[in-house]
Amino acid sequence: MQITIDTQGDRRTVTLHGNLDATTAPEVEVRMDTAGLRELVIDFTDCPFISSAGIRTILVAHRRMAASGGTLVARNLSPAVREIFDLTGLSKVIALAKTAREISVDGCELLSSGVCGECFRLDDETVVKLYKDGVHISMAEQEKTYAKAAFVLGIPTAISYDVVTCGTRSGIVFELLNAELFSAAIRRDPQLIDTHAKRLADLAASLHTAKGDAEVLPQLKDRIRDYIHQLGDAFSPAEISLLLERLDAIPDADTCVHFDLHTSNIMVQDGELVIIDMGDFSIGSNMFDIGLIYMIYGVPELGICELATKIDTATGVEFWKSFEKHYFAHRPPEERAIFEANRHFLSALRITCAIVYLPHMRDQFIRQVREILLPRIQAESRGSSA
């Protein structure tokens, strides 16, 4: 039995890989810590069988959640597991999440392809973002929730519809009328690179002034810390300690942060920029976004720019230089100082976290962090303590 845990604030998703029976139930019960949770989701996508011992484990977790005023939800039950839930009456006790709608993208226009997924145009009014194989459906459900929160805050984001599946992949459908990918617009008119960069800088500045709803949005620093703690098989205790130390040094904030803000997650609709990817929308320091943008466009040796945006590396570097100039032009000087002291650490965070949830990129990201970014982070740490 393999157990995957994803904690987002007071919501935790526990994904079971294997049978939940007398052999595995004790470990599952230990791992399903309910303290401080408002919602505990148990995902049965890869769990083909549950025994009476497994049922008792689920009931124990349900009682704990109920006693603290929380909710336990079971989702993605196979027909065999659903039958067991029905026969035992468990389906009348435990909340069951509805099954996502199945779609096909055969013949659909591919708008963009990146590290996490692909965007397809379904029709003149809607697009779907499909996550890569191996990315859990909870990511799509989370994105829908955060997209709605951003829309309410007035952040220019596409209207989200429903969570869907396409074969073994999951995704989310958005409304977008006659829109073009921002990366495509940049590739078409690279001579306007400074103008394009200023548009992203203005969008980022606007997003970073919005106050986040703590009832809906998680604290990004807490999420990052949780991911780092799961990297014991990839990095040494000293390296993990260093990453956590650098994370704690980044100031807290009560404003919004996107954590995947780049030109292939933005569409141009009627001349306005509209964000289409809100899966990591959170509350936290704007430095997390600036580090992500720097990683994609300003660190050419990583090769992320062409992978994520199809913009050539040299153009990406010019884009970063212009973005940096425009973004920090109207920010407090201390923000620029924080970024300069932590730029390599901040640039490493996105791919460091992705080691946990993007299995198809795991080896590459570990190598890039270890060989390229960690030595620079260590140098930053020595500089800050000097």
Residue ranges of each PLM-predicted region?
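Juxta-kinase regulatory segment immediately upstream of eukaryotic protein kinase catalytic domains
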Residues: 100-106
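Catalytic activation segment of kinase domains across protein kinase-like and atypical kinase folds
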Residues: 267-290
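ATP-binding pocket architecture of kinase catalytic cores
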Residues: 109-215, 251
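An alpha-helical support segment within catalytic cores of ATP-dependent transferases
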Residues: 209-259, 263-270
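Short beta-strand/loop segment at the start of cytosolic alpha/beta domains
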Residues: 1-15
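ATP/Mg2+ or Mg2+-diphosphate-binding catalytic cores
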Residues: 349-386
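Active-site activation/catalytic loop segments of kinase-like enzymes and analogous catalytic loops
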Residues: 290-331, 346-362
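Amphipathic alpha-helical interaction surfaces in cytosolic regulatory modules
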Residues: 22-93
